[in-house]
Amino acid sequence: MDVADLPGVPEWLPDHLRDDGIEELYPPQAEAVEAGVTEGENLVASIPTASGKTLIAELAMLSSVARGGKALYIVPLRALASEKQADFEEFEQYGLDIGVSTGNYESEGGWLADKDIVVATSEKVDSLVRNDAPWIEDLTCVVTDEVHLVDDGERGPTLEVTLAKLRRLNPDLQTVALSATIGNAEALATWLDAGLVDSDWRPIDLQKGVHYGQALHLEDGSQQRLSVQNNEKQTAAIVRDTLEDDGSTLVFVNSRRNAEAAAGRLANTVRPHLSTEERDQLADIAEEIRDVSDTETSDDLADAVADGAAFHHAGLSRGHRELVEDAFRDRLVKVVCATPTLAAGVNTPSRRVVVRDWRRYDGSAGGMAPLSVLEVHQMMGRAGRPGLDPYGEAVLIASSHDEVDELFERYVWADPEPVRSKLAAEPALRTHILATVASGFARSRKGLLEFLEQTLYASQTDDSGQLERVVDDVLTYLQRNDFLEIEAGELDATSLGHTVSRLYLDPMSAAEIVDGLRDWERGASDSTSASGSPADAQAEPPANSGFTTASELAEDADESDADRDPDDISALGLYHLVSRTPDMYQLYLRSGDREEYEMELFEREEELLGPTPSEFEEGRFEDWLSALKTARLLEDWATEVDEATITDRYGVGPGDIRGKVETAQWLLGAAESLASEVDLDAARAISEARIRVEHGVREELVDLAGVRGVGRKRARRLFQAGITDRAQLRDADKAVVLAALRGRRKTAENVLENAGHRDPSMEGVEPAPDVSVDLNDGADGDASAESTANDDQASLGDF
């Protein structure tokens, strides 16, 4: 189909597409147009990577906006939101306004009301619906990317419920769902009342195969000689062979440690193939990487990149990941060793893809388990860059003849698995049932079940009784913890329930926080956790359990004569409290950690909020220690321990630190609101702990670190130079500020301007010679420097 023949699109679009080199649509795109995607029809497009899904989305959204509507593009990851924002901003030259929102789950996003196209994560859209964002009802088109992720146990239920709510709010809403090739695309189309484009067409050929011995065995039965030289690993041989043909390679491995180790080894393979110009450019990129953060991870990445290799995983900071992705797309970095996060939609294709590890550790299986066909096919789909490569090759690694046959049967010739809803799990339903009632989507048990009948889960199961049983268990839990009132089948969210829904908390997290704060304030030694499972909540609590609902607590708060001073709550106690909630991904206990944190617990147990589980409660006690380890990381961050020490001490990457800090910041903010809701006097202590962990500083630096552009390291330098708060910075001697900031004029000007200095210009100013600061970290890689206006809250699960 010629772009001139597109129906229903803005008149400027055909010329715009031609300017981008697009004269005719790909076959799947033409099928989508024939199915009515530019005329408001619902559509599911299940097609391979790089087959034109983004243009299908753009056709749907732009035609909807041309009819006077408003479009929403839902992405699974924050990184994808930034990428799509950059893509769609091309349309601003034609008068369209693009907005992106991925954080601040308490906001209704009023500023998005005037945007023509909004890009957001599914969690953000869910929170907008909960907070009654009025512009949601103005939507005429919603596109959801990677819709096959409804199969994901953690994020899938949110996407599923959010789509169901949007379709109920806007009965005429056009829904376009983009998916990888899956085994049951027709089931998604049926659920969404949509037409279906189900195609395996690709713009360039993809050859799949298995490497073993001295040959690459391809799916058509042919063999290609690919020799392994003396002492050379198979992966290195494949990378070398690709380099000799001027190609790039993506290597997928099963852990962060393996990604880093493989990149270090493959750098030796790449180095001899680099030109002098490439070496110089890579050296500059390596220095940029070192500037992002002063950590061992940053140094290891910079060393690899200098030699044309890189690793990529969720433990890297956003700055690291963007530098790696850009260098790979620019063909400077020749090989990237990645965990499967890179296969989740970020646009980084390569000539060859090597799936080195097809098993990974699975705690539920008690050991190593094979990857799904869908995951492996997603990785393989990254092979081949349209317009750059004549073909793409995807290679699995076999260690024996038998394994060659197994890999062909398991992955090369196999069809992807069907996607299945994960909504019926109790943790997912806890959150979404409360939100559904609090936002008015259901006001009775019957209405709740009717709403859930609109989900994918309901369309995939014949056992409605199972859903009813789980729903009733969850309703009992929510009632027992004072989140819902239930009378004669009618459901009403309590004030606390509304607050929890607005804060985007798992109700179990809220129960844990309220109970922990209550335990501290009342000084009770016999209280029990309010975070038992819904099944446990069916039984009446024992008479001596100390269980008190939040409403009862509010009535009793003034009557207790055994209260502790709420200002005595330690930061560690609060960090531990939020670290043991379901909304925080705890650090694992490594070998040898248990003894260390048992000793830590013995020494600091009095600071913790709530009763410590018995050592005989193996699972709960282990979780308690894991939460303590996580809390200690947060405490280190808030007491200005440098990032390099934290990454080494806890075995994490810079991105992990940022993730834990942002999640703790959000949960502590929620704890402040909960404390006020149930009349607990801990808000001031919680606020201080939140601000300190937000900026990563001790108490005396809180005011300084709050100045935009300062951050933890610069705040300490300014403090040591005698500038102790924002007011002093506003009136400070510019020479002293310049010296404290190590002569960086632009940085000093920005800091002074943000502090409100009457004349922030550094023209003609020299650093004061008598100012010295006792910091030898060598980098200004404050975590805060990585944030932008759009990064006010981390999207949970991205880390």
From Swiss-Prot:
Extent of motif DEAH box: 145-148
Location of region: Disordered: 522-566, 750-799
Top-level taxon: Archaea
Keyword terms, alphabetized: ATP-binding, DNA damage, DNA repair, DNA-binding, Helicase, Hydrolase, Isomerase, Nucleotide-binding
InterPro entries reported for this sequence: DEAD/DEAH_box_helicase_dom, Hel308-like_dom4, Hel308_SKI2-like, Helicase_ATP-bd, Helicase_C-like, Helicase_Hel308, HTH_61, P-loop_NTPase
Biological process annotations from GO: DNA repair
Ranges of residues in domain Helicase ATP-binding: 34-200
Residue spans of biased composition, Acidic residues class: 553-566
The protein's Enzyme Commission number: 5.6.2.4
Domain Helicase C-terminal: start-end pairs: 234-435
Gene3D superfamilies associated with the record: 1.10.3380.30, 5' to 3' exonuclease, C-terminal subdomain (1.10.150.20), P-loop containing nucleotide triphosphate hydrolases (3.40.50.300)
GO molecular function annotations of the record: 3'-5' DNA helicase activity; ATP binding; ATP hydrolysis activity; DNA binding
Catalysis performed (reactions): Couples ATP hydrolysis with the unwinding of duplex DNA by translocating in the 3'-5' direction; ATP + H2O = ADP + phosphate + H(+)
A Pfam family this chain is assigned to: HTH_61
Keyword match Acyltransferase: no
NCBIfam families: PRK02362.1
Record family assignment: Belongs to the helicase family. Hel308 subfamily.
Subunit text: Monomer.
Full protein name: ATP-dependent DNA helicase Hel308
Organism lineage: Archaea, Methanobacteriati, Methanobacteriota, Stenosarchaea group, Halobacteria
